[in-house]
Amino acid sequence: MKNKLLFMMLTILGAPGIAAAAGYDLANSEYNFAVNELSKSSFNQAAIIGQAGTNNSAQLRQGGSKLLAVVAQEGSSNRAKIDQTGDYNLAYIDQAGSANDASISQGAYGNTAMIIQKGSGNKANITQYGTQKTAIVVQRQSQMAIRVTQR
């Protein structure tokens, strides 16, 4: 019941500026690419990108407060980038296999950033400006690298 209520709240709050991209590119099922920029209605936005296939890539840009950005990728060449400006934002990237790469950039205060990578090329970068910020990075082996900058 609690999960259902949370889902409904996120759906209602994110409705004015929600966008989602998932699955395969219509032109070629082996290349995934998604770019999402939300800049109107500057609060309570939710952007969710989920990809599965081969040459993954995703890019998000949000401006405002109380924003949610989620990118989840599965196999192959992965990449992801999230850029949020404003306060009380949450950015989440989860990648699974292959060349991985990830980046999150947040400005203002009260922001939370999470990157979870599971295998292969790994790299991660979180840059946060402002106060009251949280950064979480979990890498479960392969070549790994990490840079977290909080100012």
Swiss-Prot record:
GO terms for biological process: amyloid fibril formation; cell adhesion; curli assembly; regulation of amyloid fibril formation; single-species biofilm formation. GO terms for molecular function: identical protein binding. Disruption phenotype: When disrupted in a cellulose-synthesizing strain (with a functional bcsQ gene), cellulose is made but colony morphology indicates no curli are made. It is found in: Fimbrium. Residues 1-21 form the signal peptide. Keywords: Fimbrium, Signal. InterPro entries: Curlin_rpt. One of its GO terms (cellular component) is cell outer membrane. Pfam families: Curlin_rpt. Curlin is the structural subunit of the curli fimbriae. Curli are coiled surface structures that assemble preferentially at growth temperatures below 37 degrees Celsius. Curli can bind to fibronectin. The minor subunit is the nucleation component of curlin monomers. Coexpression of cellulose and thin aggregative fimbriae (curli fimbrae or fibers) leads to a hydrophobic network with tightly packed cells embedded in a highly inert matrix that confers cohesion, elasticity and tissue-like properties to colonies. Cellulose production is abolished in E.coli K12 / MG1655 and W3110 due to a premature stop codon in bcsQ. NCBIfam families: PRK10101.1 (NF007506). This is Minor curlin subunit.
